[in-house]
Regions:
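Short, glycine/acidic-enriched loop or turn micro-motifs at the edges of active sites
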Residues: 15, 21
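Catalytic beta-strand/loop signature of glycosyltransferases that borders the donor
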Residues: 115-117
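C-terminal structural segments of small proteins and small subunits
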Residues: 119-121
Length: 137
């Protein structure tokens, strides 16, 4: 019997922004894997809301609402994994933002593929599966 591998994808904030800007490569890949196989973190939603408040544009608040409806959300719950990631990076003299470490912790603990345009940033985290949908294939 052949077992099929079925990835579930966690979309980083930059991918959601690219989707809202109608990035052809992100839209194409989303169609290939299906929106039902893509999730976001509450952290991503928080970052999108920050951008909406920063811009002050009603359209951006509407965009966040659409993203929120489109994708299932993972709550912030992998606090211990965040601490481990932060400690491991600090021991190596490396640093990424706290929000990104929470997103990475979710991807690791839930066995998700993290989709980001910032692969170099996240590849510092051992064991994290990362894809860049912003690159054209």
């Amino acid at each position: 019997m052949i077992m099929s591998t079925h990835n579930i994808y966690l979309l980083d904030t930059c991918i959601c922004v690219a989707l809202l800007k109608k990035s052809p490569s992100v839209i194409q890949r989303l169609r290939e894997v299906g929106t039902h196989n893509c999730k976001i973190s509450d952290i991503t939603l928080a970052e999108l809301y920050f951008g909406a408040f920063k811009s002050g544009k009603e359209k951006h608040f509407n965009d966040v609402s659409e993203i929120s409806k489109l994708f299932e959300k993972y709550p912030i719950r992998h606090i211990r994994k965040y601490g481990e990631i932060r400690w491991e990076l600090e021991k190596q003299g490396l640093r990424i933002g706290d929000m990104d470490m929470f997103i990475a912790a979710t991807a690791l603990e839930e066995d998700l593929v993290l989709v980001t345009g910032n692969v170099k940033h996240f590849e510092r985290i051992p064991g994290l599966k990362v894809e860049n949908w912003m690159e054209r294939k």
